[in-house]
Amino acid sequence: MRQEIHPKYTEVTVTCSCGNTFVTRSTAGKKEMNIDICSECHPFYTGKQRIVDTAGRVDKFKKRFGGMKKYN
């Protein structure tokens, strides 16, 4: 393999918005990384159904279409 063509692979501390912190390796070039959701709080891994809305999309949808009548 040719030397010095690959990015550096360093340890990164990842912090989730739920408070979970773990260390992994990455080529991102940062020592710390913040994420919105991880395996500790994601509904698929926890088995709990909840709405994950980080940008207010659900509230925006309900505001826009919440007053509509249901048609059968």
Swiss-Prot record:
How and how many cofactors are bound, per the record note?
Binds 1 zinc ion per subunit.
The entry lists its GO molecular-function terms as: metal ion binding; rRNA binding; structural constituent of ribosome
List this protein's GO terms for biological process: translation
Q: Name one Pfam family in it.
A: Ribosomal_L31
User: By its UniProt entry, which PROSITE patterns does this protein fall under?
Assistant: RIBOSOMAL_L31 (PS01143)
A single GO CC term for this protein reads: ribonucleoprotein complex
Its domain of life reads Bacteria
- Tell me the cofactors it needs: Zn(2+)
The residues the record assigns to binding Zn(2+) are: C16, C18, C38, C41
| UniProt cross-references to InterPro entries, sorted A to Z | Ribosomal_bL28/bL31-like_sf, Ribosomal_bL31, Ribosomal_bL31_A, Ribosomal_bL31_sf
Keywords, sorted A to Z: Metal-binding, Ribonucleoprotein, Ribosomal protein, RNA-binding, rRNA-binding, Zinc
Presence of keyword Ribonucleoprotein: yes
What family name appears in the similarity comment? Belongs to the bacterial ribosomal protein bL31 family. Type A subfamily.
Q: What does this protein do?
A: Binds the 23S rRNA.
Assembly mode: Part of the 50S ribosomal subunit.
- Name-wise, this protein is Large ribosomal subunit protein bL31
Organism field = Francisella tularensis subsp. holarctica (strain LVS)
